């Protein structure tokens, strides 16, 4: 029997292999959620790391400052999904020999600016030689309560903190050269080159959300992950498609639903809220400067469907996946 290669397995099978190798852990959250949590003398110490690789995560149009910014935002977004404010961050950077020193400084500046944007600092790190640029960020924070992926119950309201399809359309514009309307271009490109994390919204939602995940791998995949972890299904009654993404799809003969459901690189939060907490949660998010968009409901039937033109259609469990996408 031939050994399976990483390129054949894909990122999610690699994660499954890691979980199998490590086994069950004693921490409150098992491996596979958005963050790790350990008991540090009665304090919930929250840890997060995520990696950015030039060949898969950095479009040619992305400037060094934006690379550093994105590397931090990717991590903050997962902390936001758990309702945790980062306290500090460190960077580990692999740098090719022909990378310019000035660009390196700009990258570090971008990472530092992003950290300060979300209320913490980069306090150290490591550098090494590498064949291509690799930036790994690790964040730490503390929390009394973590919003898991596994808390959704039938009847809970499914909601997001924003509209979808912008980053997916933006990537097609940048990488494939598909045309965008002049008035829409910034709305499409900005989420790709300078994404934002919904930290204020995540902190506001923490007392109310029963389950939460960030949407960096796509809306459909995020909903399926919540369904799998919580043992429920979902009925998506309203797919939150950004108007600029819908126009881009129309102009380029693309499916707006595919852009919204199956794209990646979007950093919205996908949450479930018990019905009795909906008004308070929506008010808290609004007071934090954000918005909470109701998109569906958790169901006892363990499948994910969307209502499209008055009929239910299956939502496939797919999204962005390293090695396979």
Where are these regions (language model features)?
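Helix-biased detector of long, well-ordered alpha-helical tracts
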Residues: 1-325
């Amino acid at each position: 029997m031939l050994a399976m290669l990483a390129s054949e397995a894909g990122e999610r099978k690699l994660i499954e292999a890691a979980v199998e190798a490590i086994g069950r852990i004693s921490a409150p959250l098992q491996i596979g959620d958005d963050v790790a949590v350990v008991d540090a003398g009665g304090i919930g110490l929250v840890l997060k790391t995520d990696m950015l690789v030039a060949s898969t995560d950095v479009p040619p149009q992305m400037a060094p400052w934006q690379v550093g910014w994105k590397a931090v935002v990717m991590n903050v977004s997962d902390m936001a999904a758990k309702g945790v404010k980062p306290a500090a961050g460190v960077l580990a950077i692999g740098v090719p020999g022909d990378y310019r020193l000035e660009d390196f400084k700009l990258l570090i500046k971008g990472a530092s600016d992003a950290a300060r944007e979300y209320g913490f600092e980069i306090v150290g790190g490591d550098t090494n030689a590498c064949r291509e640029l690799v930036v790994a960020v690790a964040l730490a924070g503390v929390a009394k309560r973590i919003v898991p992926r596994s808390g959704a119950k039938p009847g809970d309201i499914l909601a997001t903190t924003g509209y979808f399809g912008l980053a997916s359309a933006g990537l097609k514009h940048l990488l494939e050269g598909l045309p965008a309307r002049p008035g829409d271009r910034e709305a499409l490109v900005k989420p790709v080159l300078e994404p934002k994390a919904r930290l204020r919204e995540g902190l506001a939602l923490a007392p109310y959300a029963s389950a939460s995940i960030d949407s960096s791998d796509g809306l459909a995949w995020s909903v399926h992950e919540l369904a799998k972890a919580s043992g429920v299904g979902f009925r998506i009654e309203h797919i939150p498609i950004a108007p600029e993404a819908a126009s881009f799809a129309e102009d380029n003969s693309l499916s707006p639903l595919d852009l919204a459901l199956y794209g990646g690189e979007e950093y919205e939060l996908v949450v479930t809220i018990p019905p009795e907490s909906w008004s308070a949660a929506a008010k808290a998010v609004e007071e934090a400067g954000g918005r909470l968009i109701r998109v569906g409901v958790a169901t006892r039937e363990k499948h994910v469907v969307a209502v499209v033109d008055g009929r239910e259609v299956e939502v496939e469990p797919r999204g962005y996946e390293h090695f396979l996408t």
